[in-house]
From Swiss-Prot:
Keywords: ATP-binding, Kinase, Lipid A biosynthesis, Lipid biosynthesis, Lipid metabolism, Nucleotide-binding, Transferase. Transmembrane segments: none annotated. One of its GO terms (molecular function) is tetraacyldisaccharide 4'-kinase activity. Belongs to the LpxK family. It comes from the Bacteria. Transfers the gamma-phosphate of ATP to the 4'-position of a tetraacyldisaccharide 1-phosphate intermediate (termed DS-1-P) to form tetraacyldisaccharide 1,4'-bis-phosphate (lipid IVA). Its EC number is 2.7.1.130. ATP binds at T55, A56, G57, G58, N59, G60, K61, T62. One of its GO terms (biological process) is lipopolysaccharide core region biosynthetic process. This is Tetraacyldisaccharide 4'-kinase. It is an enzyme of class 2 (transferase). The gene is lpxK. GO terms for cellular component: plasma membrane.
Amino acid sequence: MIEKIWSGESPLWRLLLPLSWLYGLVSGAIRLCYKLKLKRAWRAPVPVVVVGNLTAGGNGKTPVVVWLVEQLQQRGIRVGVVSRGYGGKAESYPLLLSADTTTAQAGDEPVLIYQRTDAPVAVSPVRSDAVKAILAQHPDVQIIVTDDGLQHYRLARDVEIVVIDGVRRFGNGWWLPAGPMRERAGRLKSVDAVIVNGGVPRSGEIPMHLLPGQAVNLRTGTRCDVAQLEHVVAMAGIGHPPRFFATLKMCGVQPEKCVPLADHQSLNHADVSALVSTGQTLVMTEKDAVKCRAFAEENWWYLPVDAQLSGDEPAKLLTQLTSLASGN
């Protein structure tokens, strides 16, 4: 229902307009206060790059963060990552991730990013505290990438990158809750790069596709082509589950059942195992896998995806960030 409201298919969005106007008024006032320096943002001693969204829901932001961190690491840059840690609850903040940190403590995305990149990752509702925690433990870090936080103006940033779902784009264009917007589309004029996940990019936008890898067994780490798996049940607890189901079909998999879950939904063995009958195979997202690995069954697999950016602009962006991190 929410997708129909946000896309404009359902007329119910009109009933929510008063709340959207209030949301837009408050969010605009907050940004204006920082722009006029009525509120002061904290500036880190190293460059900060924000990778965020204008809309609620999954746009492919986390794969972009992983891509960015890995690309900078390959260029010899030492990167730290900070996040709000949605879906997690730590005993105290800031929380610097370690090999023992769970998704219940830090949230799904920070654990995934930590496991994929081995970069220092810290979470805190106050992102500046997370930055300070990283720099205290890893003083050699040259640049900070913040996963989400475009609207977290308390942390000053040097580069802003926005990720857009190229198919859904901005829906009906209204602020939450009548539409999907955290900020209106005009905000794109002030950011440094716009990355479009799928669909048809517009002038000045960087095209991106999510490239699936081999399926990975949660218990053994064994890899195989996902099309080799039989009697598949697909599970996705991400911002936009249909994208994952479409990816499986693109890989030649016709799931016997597709199970969409809420983003950041808590998972346990009983609930997940109940999705699969004898002889079936469960295939989930990598984001779900970080929550399920501790209690996984032998027939549970995940399908990792990597961001693939096209054109000349990604190289220019990486050159800019490398120069920033190097102090040039």
